[in-house]
Curated annotation (Swiss-Prot):
Annotated stretches, region: Disordered: 132-152
GO cellular component: cytosol
Record's keyword annotation contains Lyase: no
Cellular localisation: Cytoplasm
Biased composition (Basic and acidic residues): 132-142
Listed CDD domains: SmpB (cd09294)
Function statement: Required for rescue of stalled ribosomes mediated by trans-translation. Binds to transfer-messenger RNA (tmRNA), required for stable association of tmRNA with ribosomes. tmRNA and SmpB together mimic tRNA shape, replacing the anticodon stem-loop with SmpB. tmRNA is encoded by the ssrA gene; the 2 termini fold to resemble tRNA(Ala) and it encodes a 'tag peptide', a short internal open reading frame. During trans-translation Ala-aminoacylated tmRNA acts like a tRNA, entering the A-site of stalled ribosomes, displacing the stalled mRNA.
Chief place of localization: cytoplasm
Underlying gene: smpB
Pfam families assigned to the protein according to its UniProt record, in alphabetical order: SmpB
Alphabetic keyword roster: Cytoplasm, RNA-binding
Keyword check for Transmembrane: no
Similarity remark: Belongs to the SmpB family.
UniProt-recorded name of the protein: SsrA-binding protein
Length: 152
């Protein structure tokens, strides 16, 4: 059976600011108007993160815009959204977060077979010099690509 995947939004800043240790897939507990806003790609994951309350994980600071065609029964754009994951995955992440230097951030939000999914990652923060190295490598590879195009 093939999987239909429609990427709604990617958190490019997270890939730049952090070193990704491991990724997980989580479902999202959403309201109807939030799903419609996601289908319109009205979402922002820039400063969002995953937090734990008790033994449950929540997506925080993710902005899903209000659905414009919705009536009075609309959602709050930056509410905390519960993540739906297996217990063993939650325990794995929770144990890693107890160690110093680890965080958990969302990488992308997408629809998989019609259901909203969130790819989250266990990450470690990058130092400033690591970010500079990444920029230099990207610039060098861009220059090489452009020179190869010109030489054809």
């Amino acid at each position: 059976m093939s999987e239909n995947i429609l990427i709604v939004h990617e958190n490019k800043k997270a890939r730049f600011d952090y070193t990704i240790v491991e990724t997980y897939e989580a479902g999202l507990q959403l309201m109807g108007s939030e799903v419609k806003s996601l289908r319109n790609k009205d979402v922002q994951l820039k400063d969002s993160y995953i937090s734990f309350k008790g033994d449950e994980a929540y997506l925080q600071n993710a902005h899903i815009a209000e659905y414009k065609a919705s009536s009075y029964n609309n959602h709050v754009p930056e509410r905390h959204r519960k993540l739906l994951m297996h217990r063993n995955e939650l325990d794995e992440i929770f144990e890693a977060l107890r160690e110093k230097g680890y965080s958990c951030v969302p990488l992308k939000i997408y629809f998989k077979n019609g259901r909203a999914k969130l790819q989250i990652a266990l990450v470690k923060g990058k130092k400033t010099h690591d970010k500079r190295e990444a920029i230099k490598k990207r610039d060098v590879s861009d220059q090489i690509r452009s020179s190869l195009r010109r030489s054809r």
